[in-house]
A protein has these predicted regions:
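S-adenosyl-L-methionine
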Residues: 1-24, 31-32
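Glycine-rich, charged/polar anion/phosphate-binding loops
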Residues: 5-10, 82, 122-123
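Conserved nucleotide-binding/hydrolysis micro-motifs of P-loop NTPases
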Residues: 5-6, 27-30, 103, 142-144
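Mobile active-site "lid"/loop adjacent to the S-adenosyl-L-methionine
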Residues: 20, 26-77
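Conserved Class I SAM-dependent methyltransferase catalytic core
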Residues: 58-122
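Class I S-adenosyl-L-methionine
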Residues: 102-151
Length: 151
């Protein structure tokens, strides 16, 4: 468990650790207010499709506790920090991966991955119903190092 909330991998990945991959479902929102408005919008959309009524106060949080739904900087800030931290463990993890909900964040994330010298970057698009998101994966290992990877 992370003991310092401002970090993602520090104190979690130790010098003797080796991981085939990490996976992250980052906080999407940058504030409690933004998370609440998003929840209200989702509930209203669901209600308008089924019963035609409007819900004013959110009852559900759509799959997370408050601390999991938002953080300062939102999805872009969280994943950017994750990328910078991942660069401190280049030989300890074959692939770092994260969900990216907001397509407009991709350009900035790709620039950050370039800054930290990620060797390979992959984006996997996903769609379910009207929701489109993607998984972004990166590695600091060369093709030869990837093939030689042993867990």
């Amino acid at each position: 468990q992370q003991t310092e909330s401002r970090f993602i991998f520090k104190n979690i990945i130790t010098p003797e650790d080796k991981f085939t991959f990490t996976i992250c479902n980052p906080p999407f929102h940058s504030s409690q207010d933004e998370a609440t408005k998003s929840t209200v919008r989702k509930i209203n959309n669901l209600e308008s499709r089924s019963a035609g009524s409007k819900v004013i106060k959110p009852i559900l949080n759509f799959g997370g506790h408050n601390a999991e739904l938002w953080c300062e900087g939102g999805e872009l800030g969280f994943v950017t920090q994750m990328i910078y931290e991942s660069a401190k463990y280049p030989m300890q993890c074959l692939w770092f991966t994260t969900l990216v909900s907001k397509k407009e964040n991709l350009s900035s994330l790709y620039k950050t991955l370039s800054k930290v010298n990620a060797v390979e970057i992959k984006t996997i698009d996903m769609a379910q119903g009207q929701k489109t998101s993607r998984i972004v994966a990166w590695t600091f290992l060369s093709e030869a190092q990837q093939k030689a990877w042993k867990f």
